[in-house]
Amino acid sequence: MKFIVKLYPEIMMKSKPVRMRFTKMLETNIRNVLKKVDEDAKVQRQWDRIWVKVPNDKPELAQAFGERLACIPGIAHVVQVDEYSFTSVDDIYQQVLPVYRDQIAGKTFCVRVKRTGSHDFNSIEVERYVGGGLNQFTDAVGVRLKNPEVTVNLEIEGDKLYMVTKRIEGLGGFPMATQEDVLSLISGGFDSGVSSYQFIKKGARTHYCFFNLGGAQHEIGVKQVAYHLWKTYGESHKVKFVSVPFEPVVAEILEKIDNGQMGVVLKRMMMRTAARIAERMGIQAIVTGESLGQVSSQTLTNLNVIDRCTDMLILRPLIAMDKQDIINECRRIGTEDFAKSMPEYCGVISQKPTVKAVLAKVEAEETKFSEDLIDRIVEQAVAIDIREIAEQMNTRITETETVVAIDTNEVVIDIRAPEEEENKPLEIEGVEIKRIPFFKLATQFADLDKQKTYLLYCERGVMSKLQALYLIEQGYHNVKVYRP
């Protein structure tokens, strides 16, 4: 069994050297991701496609491979195929017939062929021959070229016939690391998760910068969002998560800054700090989730004033998106439930925010800050490899337990993503198992029976520890981590 990875059309339009570089990078990215699923994964690059081979003795890996490929930037779509050899057009038909006889019975169908290589026939001739044979010697209703109930997809390359058994849509975009790195300001809300995802999809290695205004609980929640985005869409490359203790800045704003200017001043201080951190990391651009007119600090006038605080390029991929469109995208990429349970701190510090800030007035207000404030904040920022989040949780999860045995009043919650759970169901005889994906746990845990203890389970124990620590921070103490 194999997968044929089709490149995103924008890659195909590049010049030959750029196309080769992008294709080679995509091959490396696919290999990096799939090797974490199975060490025997085989990945081979061609000019206009990439082949992925599922080990013959491990057909169960096909679903896992397909799910991972669907989340790798730079892929238009993936087709899962079974491989056959052939000697003639009739030989092709004879091999297609037993595979599709039952599938097209009582239905309309058509045959579609893609062919590469030198043959004494063309694609249309194969379509007519195979289609005619299937129409004559099966119980199909007939051929319908437009909107058939079943499409028989075949690909021919040299003397090989590939029958397409499944088509998986890809992310599109460019392969990871074909663009320069960016530093994304992430709060854990709807907007910043989507803006981060869009730059991952565009091929930029996306690092995360979090301005902590709400203590440990807020940081844990944001780390879950960042880890989910990286693990799902950017796992092929290492990135950093930077946590900035921003409470001192907020304290000085509340104490010294005019009420109407607070929102704009806060954003300018964030941009200054992020720019300093980005420079240290060799990054040339900051990404934010700002959208025009969404809040008072995001008017054109205010955004212009905010941008004047630094020479660093500030990118706003959501600038013209409606809020509902952002939420819909948030739901699609799996960060909606995180965002719903995330506290919002930035909007409460100004009662009468200005929508037309004057640069001179804002700069005058900023002279009231302590001279070394940003220097101190930057020095206190903590940057970690995002892969270390699991290890960090191990050192902080002292308030909960990791168990291997299950007691009478304990319930196991399988928090894996639905596709993971379906691929490898958790079954424990005599034990109640609830299936709540990790991205829904924060919103659904409050509805569970408080008299019972819940054991969180995931494949590697990373997300279960994150979720346990987050729930403990919220005041729940009937939660443990289950590691059989």
UniProtKB/Swiss-Prot annotation:
List the Gene Ontology MF annotations in alphabetical order: ATP binding; CCA tRNA nucleotidyltransferase activity; tRNA binding; tRNA-uracil-4 sulfurtransferase activity
- Indicate yes or no for the key word Hydrolase: no
Q: Where is the THUMP domain?
A: 63-167
GO cellular component term of the entry, any? cytosol
Q: What InterPro entries does the annotation carry?
A: Rhodanese-like_dom (IPR001763), Rhodanese-like_dom_sf (IPR036873), Rossmann-like_a/b/a_fold (IPR014729), ThiI_AANH (IPR020536), ThiI_fer (IPR054173), ThiI_N (IPR049961), THII_Thiazole_biosynth_dom (IPR026340), THUMP_dom (IPR004114)
**Pathway the protein acts in:** Cofactor biosynthesis; thiamine diphosphate biosynthesis
**Residues in Rhodanese domain copies:** 406-484
Q: Which family does it belong to?
A: Belongs to the ThiI family.
- The molecule here is called tRNA sulfurtransferase
* Organism of this sequence: Shewanella sp. (strain MR-7)
